[in-house]
Amino acid sequence: FFIFLSQSGETADGISVMKKFKNYSSLVITNNLESTMVRLGNFALDILAKKEVAVASTKAYMAMIVVCAMLARQVSGLNTNLKNNLKAVCIAIEEVLENKELFKGISEEIVASENVFYIGRGIDYWTSLEASLKLKEVAYISTEAYSSGELKHGPIALINDKSFVLAIITQEGTNL
């Protein structure tokens, strides 16, 4: 059984993989129930984000994370407090919006940087990859994401006083 994630449901690589593994059952999690991937799959789950207008596709990305968290909770049988966790995310977003001047200053530093690096460990690495992509899409600047464990094996040579490094740390006990 395979689970495929695609906001558009038209991703060429995703379609190619689905065709290759057509003998297996699959669930497609998408924002487009009329897509090719949905037609190729056995089951579909709509993230209900509606039409995405922004290039960075943040609304659909966040909706996909929520749907995946709900699915993981259901499949695992764990009684996690997903509702409270989602409320905490909303509160954090409100705090960012309430501190516009602080984040405006940080964003100006980021844009003025020669290059930007996101680092994260474990699941935070995947968030780093997405954050790097979002920054490329909206600011058109050079940015890369690395697993923090890989940092000393090459990428650290690129970091200088004109670099900006953002560490994504959401897991308790994480050592970068």
Predicted regions and their residues:
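Solvent-exposed alpha-helices and their adjacent loops that cap or buttress functional pockets
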Residues: K20-K22, T36-R39, E108-V111, A157-N160
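Generic recognition of flexible, low-complexity loop/linker segments
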Residues: L33, K104-S107, H153-I156
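Short acidic (Asp/Glu) and glycine-rich catalytic loops that position anionic groups and cofactors
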Residues: D46-K51, V111-A112, I159-S163
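Cofactor-pocket helix-loop regions in the catalytic cores of large enzyme subunits
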Residues: N85-G120
